[in-house]
Amino acid sequence: MQAPPPEHCPGVESEQAGQVSACAGCPNQSICSDPNKKREDPGKALVAAALKDVKHKLLILSGKGGVGKSTVTTLLTRYLARSYPDSNFGVLDIDICGPSQPRLMGALGENVHQSGSGWSPVGIDDNVCLMSIGFLLGSVDDAIIWRGPKKNGMIRQFLSEVDWGNLDLLLLDTPPGTSDEHLSVVSYLKDDSAPDSVHAIIVTTPQEVALLDVRKEINFCKKQQIPIVGVIENMSGFRCGHCGHSSEIFPAKTGGAAAMCAEMEVPLLGSLPLDPAIAKACDAGEDITSVKNPTTEALEGICSKIMSSFN
């Protein structure tokens, strides 16, 4: 019989299970530290049951914060939903301490309702729904000061207690880096009997300081055996709306994402320009993917490659 886990338990599937200071004195320490005695987290079965009608799961990752990962998640979702009106898309915002999808999707102030089948995600369009901890806060200015285990518990709730229904694709907007949240969501989503049950896209900017961390993110995916759909280079250049001249705001001193992808043997899905109109629309929660511009032209090719990777 196992005792309840301590407050800061790293989790039974963590590589640190039974080894960190929080494990000292826990009656389960010997079980967790022995790989032959570890049990699978019971939450994994709950997640599998809740997501049985979700065809594909796509992690949107970034090694470095500030590269526009959440904005790219929104743009991809909006463009995919417009391009594939007969498909259903969901977005799960698991950036627990910095949830931005409610603003980007124009859903600030919306409420999450509970039914017999679980939490109902917020409807954004006819074929797009969204779930974020931002909907559960009293104010957009409320700070979330949680340790890893509590964040992991929230992620498990989002995956197992939200009524996602039938989705063709669930996009997960993750925090930057490779933290507890990433390990938690991967452990819940990975299905050993279906190795391609979850995929990843990695967002970067051209400069080397961002690419350094993207290499770590790629290695994280390879270690966790998460297939990488490809890399998106965001803010790759700025084209003046008046004269049409293109400028490199973030110069690619080492060849940018293209050179890094060739080096790491991962696909480059495409590049998105630095566009003030996109920033303005995202701040207002507006969808401008129907307007033809350099960003939507790039999104067309990127989204086509994404959908092709699932076929």
From Swiss-Prot:
Binding residues annotated for [4Fe-4S] cluster 1, in chain numbering: 9, 23, 26, 32
Keywords annotated in UniProt: 4Fe-4S, ATP-binding, Cytoplasm, Iron, Iron-sulfur, Metal-binding, Nucleotide-binding
Protein localization: Cytoplasm
Ligand binding (ATP): 63-70
UniProt binding sites for [4Fe-4S] cluster 2: 240, 243
Keyword RNA-binding assigned: no
UniProt-recorded Gene Ontology molecular function terms: 4 iron, 4 sulfur cluster binding; ATP binding; ATP-dependent FeS chaperone activity; iron-sulfur cluster binding; metal ion binding
GO cellular component: cytosol
Single biological process term from Gene Ontology: iron-sulfur cluster assembly
Family: Belongs to the Mrp/NBP35 ATP-binding proteins family. NUBP1/NBP35 subfamily.
Role: Component of the cytosolic iron-sulfur (Fe/S) protein assembly (CIA) machinery. Required for maturation of extramitochondrial Fe-S proteins. The Nubp1-Nubp2 heterotetramer forms a Fe-S scaffold complex, mediating the de novo assembly of an Fe-S cluster and its transfer to target apoproteins.
Protein name from the UniProt record: Cytosolic Fe-S cluster assembly factor Nubp1 homolog
Organism: Drosophila persimilis
